[in-house]
């Protein structure tokens, strides 16, 4: 027994059409297939995605996947209808062999896609937060290093001021000592002069007595 045959049509709608019009296109092409005596296996919107290349100035598009079975002639009818629509910017139908695909729950897929997007957003927010924390930590480190450098400089300046003060005090002490020594020398000299005067006076008195 040969594998069953089915067709898979992927078409892309303009990214700027409202959601209700997207639903209208899904319904429209389902009706086209039904009139052509084809059977619809699955009809689901894949969501807005970035295009591999620009199509008619569009960088994004709304992807819709339509799986169906029939005698093959219905494909021409479907693609003719899509070709006449300004909202369809690209379409492609591929003949598939193998087990028929099961109908998927569009709402469930939308929820899954939403969850994935939320997880990605959360991850991006977390990464941005981590980057900010790393930057803040780096800034804090730089501020601390700058503060430490300032403190080291202030400590050095304080030491230099203290050393300068000590040098000044030593110099003042030295000057005081020199002044004292000069004073002592003067006093010794004055005492010596007084003694010499006294001795001269005594000599004069002795001489006068003789």
UniProtKB/Swiss-Prot annotation:
<dbReference type="GO" id="GO:1990904">
    <property type="term" value="C:ribonucleoprotein complex"/>
</dbReference>
<feature type="compositionally biased region" description="Basic and acidic residues">
    <location>
        <begin position="120"/>
        <end position="210"/>
    </location>
</feature>
<dbReference type="InterPro" id="IPR020814">
    <property type="entry name" value="Ribosomal_S6_plastid/chlpt"/>
</dbReference>
<keyword id="KW-0694">RNA-binding</keyword>
<keyword id="KW-0699">rRNA-binding</keyword>
<protein>
    <recommendedName>
        <fullName>Small ribosomal subunit protein bS6</fullName>
    </recommendedName>
</protein>
<feature type="region of interest" description="Disordered">
    <location>
        <begin position="99"/>
        <end position="210"/>
    </location>
</feature>
<dbReference type="Pfam" id="PF01250">
    <property type="entry name" value="Ribosomal_S6"/>
</dbReference>
<dbReference type="GO" id="GO:0003735">
    <property type="term" value="F:structural constituent of ribosome"/>
</dbReference>
<dbReference type="GO" id="GO:0070181">
    <property type="term" value="F:small ribosomal subunit rRNA binding"/>
</dbReference>
<dbReference type="GO" id="GO:0006412">
    <property type="term" value="P:translation"/>
</dbReference>
<dbReference type="GO" id="GO:0005840">
    <property type="term" value="C:ribosome"/>
</dbReference>
<comment type="function">
    <text>Binds together with bS18 to 16S ribosomal RNA.</text>
</comment>
<keyword id="KW-0689">Ribosomal protein</keyword>
<dbReference type="InterPro" id="IPR000529">
    <property type="entry name" value="Ribosomal_bS6"/>
</dbReference>
<dbReference type="InterPro" id="IPR014717">
    <property type="entry name" value="Transl_elong_EF1B/ribsomal_bS6"/>
</dbReference>
<comment type="similarity">
    <text>Belongs to the bacterial ribosomal protein bS6 family.</text>
</comment>
<keyword id="KW-0687">Ribonucleoprotein</keyword>
<dbReference type="GO" id="GO:0005737">
    <property type="term" value="C:cytoplasm"/>
</dbReference>
<dbReference type="InterPro" id="IPR035980">
    <property type="entry name" value="Ribosomal_bS6_sf"/>
</dbReference>
């Amino acid at each position: 027994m040969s594998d069953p045959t089915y067709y898979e049509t992927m078409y892309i709608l303009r990214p700027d059409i409202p959601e209700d019009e997207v639903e209208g296109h899904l319904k429209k092409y389902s009706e086209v297939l039904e009139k052509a005596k084809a059977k619809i296996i699955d009809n689901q919107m894949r969501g807005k995605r970035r295009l591999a290349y620009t199509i008619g100035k569009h960088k994004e598009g709304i992807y819709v996947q339509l799986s169906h079975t029939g005698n093959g002639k219905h494909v021409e009818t479907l693609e003719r209808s899509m070709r006449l629509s300004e909202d369809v910017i690209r379409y492609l139908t591929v003949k598939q062999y193998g087990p028929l695909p099961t109908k998927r729950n569009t709402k469930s897929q939308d929820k899954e896609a939403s969850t994935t997007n939320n997880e990605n957003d959360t991850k991006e927010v977390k990464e941005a937060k981590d980057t900010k924390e790393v930057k803040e930590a780096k800034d804090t480190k730089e501020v601390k290093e700058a503060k430490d450098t300032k403190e080291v400089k202030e400590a050095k300046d304080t030491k230099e001021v203290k050393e300068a003060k000590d040098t000044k005090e030593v110099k003042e002490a030295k000057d005081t000592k020199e002044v004292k020594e000069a004073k002592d020398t003067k006093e010794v000299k004055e005492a010596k002069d007084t003694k010499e005067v006294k001795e001269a006076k005594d000599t004069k008195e002795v001489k006068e007595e003789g």
